[in-house]
Amino acid sequence: MLLIEVASCDDRADFALIARAYHFAKKYHEGQTRKSGHPFLHHCVEVARLLAQLRMDHTTVAAGLLHDVIEDTPATYGDVAAAFGDKIADLIDGVTKIDQLPYESREARQAETYRKMLLSMVKDIRVMLIKLVDRLHNMRTLEHMRAESRARTAHETLEVYAPLAHRFGLARIRWELEDSSLKFLEPEIYDELRNKVAMKRRERETYIEEFKAPIEEKLHENGIEAEFTGRAKNFYSIYNKMKARNKPFEEVYDLLAVRIITGSVRECYHILGLVHGIYAPIPERIKDYISTPKSNMYQSLHTSVIGPTGQYVEVQIRTAEMHRLAQFGYVAEMAAFFGLPIRERCEVVACPEDAALEEAAPLRMGPPQLQPAVPERERELGKCWE
């Protein structure tokens, strides 16, 4: 299934390389199990699958399969380099924790591990991406760890990995890391928020339909095509609002976010004017991240308006290209340039907005759409595992 998923993202990928990495990992992780009781290899495959969903190149997917062999098996850097070359060996070494050398404390060892990871990241940004998805899958299985380990890992995730994901524009990864950290650090609050958000789901969907109806009418009158999505904000975001305002869940009103995706920058501004003509805006909440992108190159128009019944609603307006990059990250986009050093990638990102999008255009990587492979393709991919 991993090869079929990679094929759905890049049919030019080196499937033989990925298959060799799979068999190498299988050999060295033989007999190892995780705290969950699952074979260790399952974690390696999941990390590789997540990297494939980020549209990463076959070298990175292979490194995802191998990311723990130096740290957790007898395999050495030399073994990996001999089998797969220095580039993959360097990626794996970059995400390998420093456990072999003596340190006065766990904190000192962890600090040195961070330092090593950051230095490796300067050479190749894919080190950070592998580490992020490794942490993401570890958080999905964290309940099998001891209570002390759960708390320590959740704190580290919230303080280090979620901000990294945010910094590099990986919104989906950031939200899941934040919410899963809250789940283990404040389980009662997490369960309460999850239950209350779930209870209000039908009410929320009805409200969003009522909210967007007059906007859709205006868009139709002006000949603008757009797609609407609506969601509640993630649990950690809601939790922070409750803390900052010292209010219970029921008194935090701006929990709804509506996203409008359209075809051009010009239409984004046109839609903003139409929305403000229908609903009263809150002036201090209007943000133009299109003309002035965030430091991670995120682009969108943000506004908060007073919707029906007086409830605050956040509205985000962006183009389809901006939305794709907001969801999957500019770093994932740039890292898709096979072997391109981080400094060169940063030069691409630092171009003026239009030029940056033109540079990224050939690497279109929308949300994963895993399609059944045709029989011939399945047979071809299947041979790689033999």
Segments predicted by a language model, with ranges:
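Active-site helical microenvironments for divalent-metal-assisted chemistry
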Residues: 1-313, 318-384
